[in-house]
Structure formats: C-alpha cells, structure tokens
C-alpha cells in the first residue's frame, strides 16, 4: 500500500483504470469502517480499478475526534490487509477550508476516482457542510458512482468509535471487541518498572499508554500476549498500583505472562484484551498481591485452554 501524506495526485500505476475511494476518518477500523473500505475494494475488483482510501491526519492530542484507539502504524497495517493499494492522508489543516464542491473535485481529480464510497453519516467540506446526498448531487455530472454503506449495528444501535471508547472506559471488553470486529489490543514499548513483580516471583512487562490514547477502565483483564510468533495467555493490570503507589494519577499497564521468561525491554509485543476479570484494589500485604496476580494468570490460562 502506497501512503501519500498530502492532498496531491496519486501515483497510479495504471491511471486509465481509475480508483474506487473509501472516504472517512477510520480512527478505529471497526466493523463499520471495514464495511466501507471493503465495499470500495470490492467495487474496484469488479470494475478493474485500484482500491484507495482517503482520510486525514489530526494531532496526537485533539478534541475533534476523541482519544485514539489505534497507533498510526497499526491503522496502516489493518487498512493494507483489507486490500487497499493507495492511502491518501493529508493533514486536516490542508483540507478543512475546502468547500464541499472543492473537496469532491479535488478527490475526483487527484485520485482519478470512478467511485466514491462512504458511510451514511459521512460529512465533508468546511464546517462539515456536505453529506451523502450532496455527494451524489456533486458526483452525478462527473460520472462518478457514489456508494453509501449503511452503518453497522451492535445491540440495535449504530457502531461508532465513541461507543467503543465508552465500552473501554466501562471495562466492557466483549462489547468493544464485538464493535471492533477484533480484540482490542495495544502495542507499546516495554519499559523498565520498579521491579516489584520480579521480586514477588511474578515478573511483568510494563507498558505506558502514550498521550492521546484511550485508556480502558482501571482493573485486571484476561489478555494474551504475542511474543516471537507465539500467543501466551496473560493477565494485565491497568491502574495506579494502589498497593505500592500513593500517586493515583499515574496509570501503568503491567502484564504477567506465566510460562514465559526473557528480556522484552525495548520491544513492543501485542497485548490483546479479552475479558474483564476483577477490579483494581489496594491489598494489605504483598503476599495478597502475589496471590491475586497468580490467580489472574491461572484464570487466563483456563480461558484460553
């Protein structure tokens, strides 16, 4: 997949074939986003065109779209896995002032678009003035087909990244995973911690959520961790470590991987979240903390048995 980081003509290998372009922010690549992208890929396959995605970049911390569910690298990998060949992702500042007409003409011109695909809640142009109905009106005289994909549903309500964030905040991992269409996962660098887990005989990997990422509820989760091509059952504690830390504002993510030993510092293993296990709490003794970690690990092994 070729990534183009500005609103500019795509370097199409066969310009005469044109493209089918999926449009949206696609922040979580949830089941609704995937339906839009897969529709563009399918149209391109049926009409001998190149499948493309048009989206835009926001600063890591922003108030416009909420906290991030995916890193940029993971987002690119997921979209590429769906069969997309071209990925156009200018900065939002570059396109925010375009009228709906300018926006559509720019995409049709730069992508040599034969079809534009969007969700039924898609907006475009300055102040989000455009909608799918206007998109059809603008594309008709250009001979460009418009495909509007119905919003995906979960529990009889539309799937959205906002709903996924809310599910994560509540610790409802099954709901978040159902809407994502895959396990919620993190892939952050393993950093040195205080070494308490090693002292207790339950060494953990420590990962910090970068600023701007959505945090799940602080508690203990059943997870699995991908290391060296192998998935290991694991237990992950997310929170302020109340037993040993008086600073309730410092959130850490610690994962115990029973049966694994090795140096993971500086690597970025994938940790998938599968189920809520128990609330985060302060223990009276370190022995109680050790017992809790071992019990969580046992539950994780049973879960994946």
Stretches found by the model and what they are:
Residues 60-142:
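N-terminal Rossmann-like or analogous alpha/beta NTP/dinucleotide-binding catalytic cores
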Residues 139-239:
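Glycine-rich, Lys/Arg-enriched anion-binding loops that position phosphate/diphosphate groups
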Residues 22-24, 54-55, 87-91, 115-120, ...:
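Short beta-strands and strand-loop turn motifs
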Residues 30, 79, 116, 176, ...:
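Residue-level signal for inorganic ion chemistry
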Residues 2-11, 88-89:
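Short acidic-hydrophobic, aromatic-tinged amphipathic segments that line or gate anion-handling sites
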Residues 9-13, 94-97, 153-157:
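A short acidic, often aromatic-flanked loop/helix-cap motif at beta-alpha or helix-coil junctions
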Residues 11-66, 71:
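N-terminal catalytic cores of NTP/NDP-binding nucleotidyl/phosphoryl-transfer enzymes
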Residues 193-305:
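Phosphate/ribose-recognition catalytic cores of enzymes acting on nucleotide-derived substrates
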């Amino acid at each position: 997949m070729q990534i183009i980081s500005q609103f500019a003509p795509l370097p199409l290998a066969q310009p005469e074939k044109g493209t089918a372009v999926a449009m949206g922010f696609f922040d979580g690549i949830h089941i609704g986003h995937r339906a839009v992208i897969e529709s563009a890929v399918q149209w391109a396959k049926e009409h001998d065109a190149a499948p493309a995605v048009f989206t835009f970049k926001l600063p890591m911390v922003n108030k416009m779209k909420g906290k991030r569910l995916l890193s940029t690298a993971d987002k690119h990998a997921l979209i590429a896995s769906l069969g997309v060949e071209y990925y156009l992702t200018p900065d939002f500042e570059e396109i925010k002032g375009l009228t709906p007409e300018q926006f559509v003409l720019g995409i049709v011109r730069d992508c040599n678009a034969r079809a534009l695909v969007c969700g039924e809640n898609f907006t475009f142009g300055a102040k989000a003035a455009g909608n799918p109905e206007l998109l059809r009106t603008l594309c008709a005289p250009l001979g460009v087909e418009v495909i509007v994909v119905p919003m995906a549903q979960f529990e009889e309500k539309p799937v959205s990244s906002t709903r996924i964030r809310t599910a994560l905040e509540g610790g409802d991992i099954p709901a978040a995973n159902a809407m994502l269409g895959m396990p919620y996962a993190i892939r952050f660098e393993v950093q040195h911690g205080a070494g308490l887990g090693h002292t207790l005989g339950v060494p953990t990997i420590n990962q910090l959520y970068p600023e701007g990422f959505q945090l799940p509820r602080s508690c203990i989760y059943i997870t699995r961790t991908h290391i060296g091509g192998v998935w290991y059952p694991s237990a992950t504690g997310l929170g302020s470590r109340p037993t040993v830390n008086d600073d309730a504002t410092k959130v850490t993510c610690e994962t115990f991987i029973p049966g694994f030993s090795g140096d993971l510092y500086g690597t970025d293993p994938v940790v998938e979240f599968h189920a809520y296990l128990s609330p985060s709490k302060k223990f009276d003794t370190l022995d109680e903390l050790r017992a809790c970690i071992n019990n969580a690990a046992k539950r994780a092994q049973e879960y994946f048995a």
